[in-house]
Swiss-Prot record:
Keywords: Chloroplast, Membrane, NAD, NADP, Plastid, Plastoquinone, Quinone, Thylakoid, Translocase, Transport
Enzyme type, top EC level: translocase
Protein name: NAD(P)H-quinone oxidoreductase subunit H, chloroplastic
One Gene Ontology cellular component annotation held by this UniProt entry: chloroplast thylakoid membrane
Primary localization: plastid
Gene3D superfamilies linked: Cytochrome-c3 Hydrogenase, chain B
Subunit-structure text: NDH is composed of at least 16 different subunits, 5 of which are encoded in the nucleus.
Annotated gene: ndhH
UniProt record, GO biological process: photosynthesis, light reaction
Any single Pfam family the record assigns to this protein: Complex1_49kDa
Molecular functions per Gene Ontology: NAD binding; oxidoreductase activity, acting on NAD(P)H, quinone or similar compound as acceptor; quinone binding
């Protein structure tokens, strides 16, 4: 009779880069003692495309189609940060209507991103049904995007000084209908998921991050707010016109995977509130501002001198980025998305440093999975919400 051999030594397992629950081309080298995780080393770089270097050889308007490939599930945010940086450098005033349209698009994009987090996260821990439900609502968001921008994904909609096109006729009514419908959808998710005993068994108390830990690791977004810190850049930085709307920052105290789920569910409802207020109060007026005032040039006494240049919508060289440094950030669905921009009196940026939320949030993964079970890696990694396009850039 053959006696099964038992191994006493540690086992090293490669998870990814092709594993379906890796959310892209992430590779984890996991050291196991039976089912217990002893060590975990993430290997990055499989999706590196040199996004920062490409930016240094493009004007901002030429670079806009590239940025939607960072976080390809929340493309409006990457576009927003790309146009916000030169707007602040050039002191460009965005018309009120354009600002409202931007907020609506950003919040719709946040909902689409959270939906496509929720489905695969539930599939990772064994619940297949919500994966199909979320596509029903996400499809409606993409229909709205397609009607307004012409593209379902990779919209290329934001422009320096405004947006590419105004909202089409009937779009606002269609969006209001979606808001009413989506609230019933969220209630359905909560009924299906939140009190499910198997779900709670898998997420409650798994991957706990304390307040000090969250701050020291530089976490942001739902990862930070699930640990009891009420930090949302929409409230902190007062960008666009978020101050004009009534909404609450979503947060939880426990810091586990369940808290991160609850924060994101709450954020989807808060986003609907913001969208409804923006749609009801959207002002008239232009949707773009095509001129930039030049305050840094000496006055020329000639009679026909213009003190402003026009911002081109074509991919030709636009205005020069003045010689200064600037850090701009927005509250993306995954956390703080930032750009460190150095201008050099040139149409190209001298340096374009991207601060992706996923890359920084992912750093805490090895610490969270140590002394946990192998199956908990999926739960913890899923609750972080990463997209490898922005991690590897």
């Amino acid at each position: 009779m053959n006696v099964p051999a038992t191994r006493e030594d540690l086992m090293i397992v490669n998870m990814g880069p092709h594993h379906p629950s890796m959310h892209g081309v992430l590779r984890l080298i996991v050291t196991l003692d039976g089912e217990d995780v002893i060590d975990c080393e993430p290997i990055l770089g499989y999706l590196h495309r040199g996004m920062e270097k490409i930016a240094e050889n493009r004007t901002i308007i030429q670079y806009l189609p590239y940025v939607t490939r960072w976080d390809y599930l929340a493309t409006m945010f990457t576009e927003a940060i790309t146009v916000n940086a030169p707007e602040q450098l050039g002191n460009i005033q965005v018309p009120k209507r354009a600002s409202y349209i931007r907020v609506i698009m950003l919040e719709l994009s946040r909902i689409a991103s959270h939906l496509l987090w929720l489905g695969p996260f539930m599939a990772d821990i064994g619940a297949q049904t919500p994966f199909f439900y979320i596509f029903r609502e996400r499809e409606l968001v993409y229909d709205l995007f397609e009607a307004a921008t012409g593209m379902r994904m990779m919209h290329n909609y934001f422009r320096i000084g405004g947006v590419a096109a105004d909202l089409p006729h009937g779009w606002i009514d269609k969006c209001l209908d979606f808001c009413d419908y989506f609230l019933t959808g969220v209630a359905e998710y909560q009924k299906l998921i939140t009190r499910n005993p198997i779900f709670l068994e898998r997420v409650e108390g798994v991957g706990i991050i304390g307040v000090e830990e969250a701050i020291n690791w530089g976490l942001s977004g739902p990862m930070l707010r699930a640990s009891g810190i009420q930090w949302d850049l929409r409230k902190v930085d007062h960008y666009e016109c978020y101050d004009e709307f009534d909404w609450e920052v979503q947060w939880q105290k426990e810091g586990d995977s369940l808290s991160r789920y609850l924060v994101r569910i709450g954020e989807m409802v808060a986003s609907i509130k913001i969208i409804q207020q923006a749609l009801e109060g959207i002002p008239g007026g232009p949707y773009e501002n095509l001129e930039i005032r030049c305050f840094d040039r000496a006055r020329d006494p000639e009679l026909n001198d213009f003190e402003y240049r026009f911002i081109s919508k074509k991919p030709s060289p636009t205005f020069e980025l003045s010689k200064q440094e600037l850090y701009v950030r927005v509250e993306a669905p995954k956390g703080e998305l930032g750009i460190f921009l150095i201008g050099d009196q040139n149409v190209f940026p001298w340096r374009w440093k991207i601060r992706p939320p996923g890359f920084i949030n992912l750093q805490i993964l090895p610490q969270l999975v140590k002394r946990m079970k192998l199956a908990d890696i999926m739960t913890i990694l899923g609750s972080i919400d990463i997209i490898m396009g922005e991690v590897d850039r």
